[in-house]
């Protein structure tokens, strides 16, 4: 019985943290892709901000349930961040498994592309959530702040 519990605990640790590991890796991939797009038009690169990363991951889990810029409690999407009058933006996407496909999807949308290329933005957070039993499975959030 003890061996069984150890195996179960190991499986939980391995698979329970895989979504967080994926989110962290995807954030770096998205940052690199976004900064390449910004460089093409002469806009300064963004940097990842830890607080925006945390907020974007909260939003990614929220949009699994309700794919909207409105939070589950009915409040504005920006209430998840401490922006207090700063310039900010949010991009959401669903359905693509890779950072490349997701950034490409955003770049093919006028509104999302404007956020990515906005010169006033200096920081970004990227959130990712995977839910096997949901409509789109892969959920992405970008939060921007300037």
Q: How would you describe each model-predicted region?
A:
Residues 26, 30, 48, 52, ...:
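Hydrophobic side chains within well-formed alpha-helices
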